[in-house]
């Protein structure tokens, strides 16, 4: 059996992630220690008094990007040896049931980074991210909602989360 799955979610809106994962089946699974989900506000790793997480696009253009510094600091603090960092982005690999099964079976530790604005600074993708995921061919206001979809699909495949294992198929 795989090691217990621990998921750290980095978002500008951690309450959007925590609320749907705190009740019902996933809340009970968390209470029973079958998986651990921790939601963090990226602003907690900023160093300025305004807790600024966004910056203008390098070279100009419309929109803003998530700054790399707080993301690097957060991942450095949370990362373990077996950690995989996943970025929720419309440009990523399309999430499906087989990928959910792969993530559930591997156990270990995931850090899910929820994109926002026009995305994240490219240095984050190049240096930290192991996998870019999308939940479909559409754009959401931020990656928090997408991360809940991924977490729910993965968690229900962990043995013991559902009352009847046949329900996970």
Identify the meaning behind each predicted range.
Residues 1-78:
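N-terminal nucleotide/polyanion-binding subdomain common to many enzyme families
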Residues 2, 102-106, 132:
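Solvent-exposed alpha-helices and their adjacent loops that cap or buttress functional pockets
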Residues 8-10, 38-40, 84-86, 110-111, ...:
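Hydrophobic/aromatic beta-strand patches that form the interior of the parallel beta-sheet core
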Residues 41-43, 89, 136:
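Residues at the C-termini of beta-strands that transition into short coil/loop
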Residues 43-48, 93, 139-141:
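A short acidic, often aromatic-flanked loop/helix-cap motif at beta-alpha or helix-coil junctions
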Residues 50, 97-99, 123-125:
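Short, well-ordered secondary-structure micro-motifs
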Residues 66-116:
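S-adenosyl-L-methionine/SAH cofactor-binding core of RNA-modifying enzymes
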Residues 120, 124-169:
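Structured adenosyl-cofactor binding patch, chiefly the S-adenosyl-L-methionine
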């Amino acid at each position: 059996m795989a090691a217990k799955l621990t998921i750290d979610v980095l978002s500008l809106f951690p309450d959007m992630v925590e609320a749907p994962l705190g009740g019902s089946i996933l809340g009970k699974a968390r209470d029973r220690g079958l998986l651990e989900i921790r939601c963090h506000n990226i602003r907690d790793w900023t160093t300025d008094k305004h807790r600024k997480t966004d910056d203008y696009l390098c070279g100009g253009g419309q929109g803003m990007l998530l700054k790399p510094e707080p993301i690097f600091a957060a991942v450095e603090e949370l990362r373990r040896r077996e950690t995989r960092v996943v970025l929720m982005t419309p440009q990523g690999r399309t999430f499906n049931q087989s990928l959910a099964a792969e993530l559930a079976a591997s156990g270990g530790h995931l850090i899910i980074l929820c994109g926002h604005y026009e995305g994240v600074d490219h240095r984050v993708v190049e240096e930290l991210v192991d996998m870019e995921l999308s939940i479909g061919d559409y754009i959401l206001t931020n990656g928090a909602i997408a991360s809940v979809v991924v977490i729910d699909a993965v968690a229900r495949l962990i043995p013991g989360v559902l009352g009847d294992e046949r329900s996970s198929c």
